[in-house]
Amino acid sequence: MLATRVRRRSSRLIRSRPLVVRSRMRCAAGKSNTVRLSGMAVSAHSASFGCSLHQRVRAAFKSRSASVRSGALKMARIWAATVFRASCRVVSAPAFCCRWNWQRCQGTEGSTARRAALSPA
């Protein structure tokens, strides 16, 4: 039996369409009630345009703050980075709820299954 563990991230405001954020493929051997997991391959996906936009904003902020190396501006840079990180957590955390679900794999090649079986769990 092949199963995929999928993390779905859905907005608390829009419950109609969950978004897949991360999926983990596990190759399992045995019956459904006695499943032994033999390996895992991880692939991460961007949840939505909002998440990718958020990542681009953070990358731009990091590159801008990395260019400022003055000792006099060090405290201001640290304070700005802390406030930015805190505001990102406050905005993004309550807006989404995440849940892990198991789904059946379809169309998995033999080489992919062998590679997943050899990877450390």
Curated annotation (Swiss-Prot):
Provide this UniProt record's keywords sorted from A to Z: Transposable element
Domain of life (superkingdom): Bacteria
Q: What protein name does the entry list?
A: Insertion element IS406 uncharacterized 13.3 kDa protein
